[in-house]
């Protein structure tokens, strides 16, 4: 009889623990954006020009389109190409520079492509939220590769990283 009572207590305690923990939940989430005010509904991305001393002709159109797509796909904002957009994004490629970062003896072993972007963000509903800042993406690569090879193979990576950096400057409060 004693064994029966002990086993019954174990079953009841086990059932109660399962029952209690089934209602206890913990939710953790990570979003790339801070909350966008409810009155902000539209955005406009102006053509992002290339004003660097060296112009990669593919960079500006790709940067412009990828930034638009990132905002459309990750926020609730609608694109508006008029002057009355709530968020107005503009800017230009300010730097496109190749440098040597690694040397062995008298030979370069590693090079760096630095791509800088000057961001101008206007919040037409709250001037205090306007931003004017610079972002830079550095890509290190083997010095035996040429710039056209790197632009061809790493162009999407460069654009993606710049878009992420621009997006985070606008939408994240980190």
Predicted segments with their positions:
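Surface-exposed short loop/turn segments
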Residues: 73-130, 138-149
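A broad, low-specificity signal marking well-ordered, structured residues that form hydrophobic/aromatic
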Residues: 43, 89, 133
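A structural "domain/chain start" motif
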Residues: 23-68, 72-78, 125, 168-174
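C-terminal/domain-edge helix-coil "capping" segments
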Residues: 27, 123-131, 138-174
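Bacterial N-terminal signal peptides
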Residues: 14-23
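Soluble non-cytosolic domains of exported or imported proteins
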Residues: 54-65, 108, 112, 149-161
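Bacterial N-terminal signal peptides that target proteins for export
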Residues: 2-13
């Amino acid at each position: 009889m004693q064994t029966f009572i002990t086993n019954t207590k174990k079953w009841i305690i086990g059932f109660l623990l399962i029952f209690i923990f089934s209602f206890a939940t913990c939710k953790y989430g990570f979003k790339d954006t801070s909350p966008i005010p409810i009155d902000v509904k539209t955005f406009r991305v102006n053509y992002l020009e290339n004003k660097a001393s060296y112009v990669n002709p593919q960079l500006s159109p790709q940067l412009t389109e990828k930034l638009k797509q990132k905002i459309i796909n990750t926020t609730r904002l609608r694109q508006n190409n008029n002057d009355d957009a709530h968020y107005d994004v503009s800017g230009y490629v300010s730097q496109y520079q190749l440098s040597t970062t690694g040397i062995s003896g008298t030979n370069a072993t590693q090079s760096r492509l630095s791509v800088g972007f000057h961001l101008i963000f206007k919040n037409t509903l709250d001037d205090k939220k306007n931003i004017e800042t610079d972002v830079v993406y550095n890509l290190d690569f083997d010095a035996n590769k040429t710039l056209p090879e790197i632009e061809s193979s790493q162009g999407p990576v460069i654009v993606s990283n710049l878009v992420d950096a621009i997006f985070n400057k606008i939408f994240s409060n980190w």
